[in-house]
Structures are given as structure tokens and as C-alpha cells.
């Protein structure tokens, strides 16, 4: 742990943009997942009791794409205990936490409490149709939490929700 955070200019620009909903479409290996991990980490450090939820097409994909990166970024003095490998969760001493989930287990995404304050949708073009309106949008409706949403993906044709 304790990896120094280094961002390209375009990543820094996306990170500091104050928009509530952000979408990033780009080719493979440009650093989308790294940026998502940094954004979730910083979000949880900024204020106590925040909840970041990072969702990928499958649990195994999210474990490979973001979990290892996230674990390398966190400073041990910021977290409570150790990253939870089975739950794919990092708890912070300020009460915030980051949880990773997959859309291959959609029922695990319904009724998450407290509602997330930051949601990352990784490789969204590969997530089933209508997932955003059926599962994610209700999570953003809590007026007190006002969840920010960061959608990232490599494009995949024109027949998916990411394209729309």
C-alpha cells in the first residue's frame, strides 16, 4: 500500500470537474479504472461517512480492474483494519467506505443502505440493458446523499446503454 497518485492532465481534468454525472468513453489502457479508483478514494477521504460504490459487469472483472489498484493506493493510516478481500470493501477511519460489486449479482445492489454518495460504473457498455434506470438511478434519488455518478467504459457498438 501507499502508492503515490500520479494522474495525466486529462485525468486530473475529469477528477476536478464538479459535475454530478460524468461520462468517460475512451480506448483500452488509458487509465479509466485507475482514475475511478483515485476518485473513489479521494471522495471517501474528503468527508466522513461517505459511501463509494464501484460496480463492474462481474465481480471477477471489478476485482481485476479496480480492486488491486485501489488497494495499492490506500494509505494504511487512512483505513480501519485491512481491505476486506471477500467483501471487496475498504473501511476508512472517518467512517467512509468503498465497496466493489458486480452486475452479475444484481440483487446484491438493491437496497444498499446507506445510499451511496459516489457511484462508479466501470465498463458500462458491458452491463445489461436498463441496469442504470432499474438499479442505479434509484440509488441517486436520496436528496440528502446526492450521489455523484462516474460512468466509464470502452465503447462497444451502438446497442447498449452506454452508447445511448
Region annotations inferred by a language model:
Residues 1-164:
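Phosphate/NTP-binding elements of NTP-utilizing enzymes
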Amino acid at each position: 500500500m501507499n502508492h503515490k497518485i500520479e494522474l495525466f492532465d486529462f485525468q486530473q481534468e475529469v477528477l476536478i470537474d464538479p459535475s454530478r454525472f460524468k461520462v468517460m468513453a475512451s480506448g483500452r489502457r488509458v487509465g479509466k479504472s485507475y482514475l475511478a479508483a483515485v476518485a473513489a478514494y479521494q471522495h471517501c477521504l474528503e468527508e466522513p461517512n461517505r459511501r463509494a460504490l464501484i460496480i463492474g459487469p462481474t465481480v471477477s472483472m471489478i476485482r481485476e480492474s479496480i480492486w488491486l489498484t485501489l488497494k495499492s493506493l490506500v494509505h494504511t493510516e487512512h483505513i480501519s483494519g485491512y481491505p476486506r478481500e471477500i467483501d471487496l470493501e475498504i473501511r476508512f477511519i472517518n467512517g467512509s467506505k468503498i465497496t466493489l460489486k458486480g452486475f452479475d449479482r444484481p440483487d446484491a445492489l438493491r437496497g444498499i443502505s446507506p445510499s451511496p454518495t459516489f457511484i462508479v460504473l466501470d465498463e458500462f457498455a458491458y452491463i445489461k440493458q436498463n441496469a442504470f434506470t432499474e438499479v442505479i438511478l434509484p440509488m441517486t434519488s436520496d436528496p440528502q446523499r446526492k450521489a455523484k455518478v462516474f460512468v466509464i467504459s470502452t465503447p462497444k457498438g451502438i446497442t447498449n446503454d452506454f452508447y445511448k
